């Protein structure tokens, strides 16, 4: 069972290394980079989902299960309109949109706009703030943040234009129509204490107890087991 692992904003594929010792034997995981991250050449910006699809097509085979975390989940969903669909899509810490109306938690449009302004002024400092922000819901937030910094370093492995494009996608992507009538089975998972998601988005997902937005740091073994379990269930569903 092939799993293609897709990371979120400002975080390259090294985030998935914590799961390497915990995958059950049928799973063949492969963590891939988005354009502009790691050694993957960046796309010219501004760019489109169609251009992203053209670049990512060799990395996203249809005979696999895609696993998209955070922005990676939003992008993977949007790509369903442009690429042959996978056997299934697992969304981790992602809903149909990034921003919420603020009535039941999550990140509001005003909060994201403030973050974008801060990023334009000081990209690296704002990225470091984001690492602290997304670690907040973990049971040991300081330890989760320490792990993030140790794994990712002092600066993002992505160029500033790529990161700015990612923030624009967080602002604008709306996958409600796609998720209402998807071309493949879709299963959702979320940390029970993920402060970046609204409570209504978390309630639509299989919740991982004692985890926030980064369950690969706080709950690597349970997360690997749940991803394998949900992928197996999704593969048994009619397409």
For each feature predicted by the language model, list its residue ranges.
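Gly/Ala-rich beta-loop-alpha elbow adjacent to hydrolase catalytic centers
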Residues: 68-72, 76
């Amino acid at each position: 069972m092939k799993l293609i692992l897709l990371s979120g904003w400002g975080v390259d594929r090294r985030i998935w290394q914590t799961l390497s010792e915990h995958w059950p034997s049928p799973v063949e995981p492969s963590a891939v980079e988005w354009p502009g991250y790691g050694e993957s050449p960046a796309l010219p910006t501004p760019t489109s989902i169609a251009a992203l699809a053209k670049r990512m097509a060799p990395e996203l085979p249809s005979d696999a299960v895609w696993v998209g975390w955070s922005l990676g989940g939003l992008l993977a969903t949007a790509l369903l309109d442009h690429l042959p669909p996978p056997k299934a899509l697992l969304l981790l810490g992602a809903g149909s949109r990034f921003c919420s109306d603020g009535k039941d938690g999550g990140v509001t449009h005003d909060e994201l706009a403030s973050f974008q302004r801060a990023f334009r002024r000081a990209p690296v400092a704002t990225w470091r703030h984001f690492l602290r922000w997304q670690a907040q819901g973990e049971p040991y937030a300081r330890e989760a943040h320490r792990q993030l910094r140790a794994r990712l370093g002092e600066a993002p492995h992505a160029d500033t234009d790529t990161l700015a494009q990612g923030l624009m996608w967080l602002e604008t992507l709306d996958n409600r129509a796609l998720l209402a009538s998807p071309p493949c089975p879709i299963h959702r998972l979320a940390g029970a204490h993920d402060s970046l998601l609204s409570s209504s988005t978390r309630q639509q997902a299989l919740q991982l107890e004692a985890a926030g937005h980064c369950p690969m740091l706080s709950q690597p073994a349970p997360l690997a087991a749940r991803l394998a379990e949900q992928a197996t269930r999704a593969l048994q569903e009619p397409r």
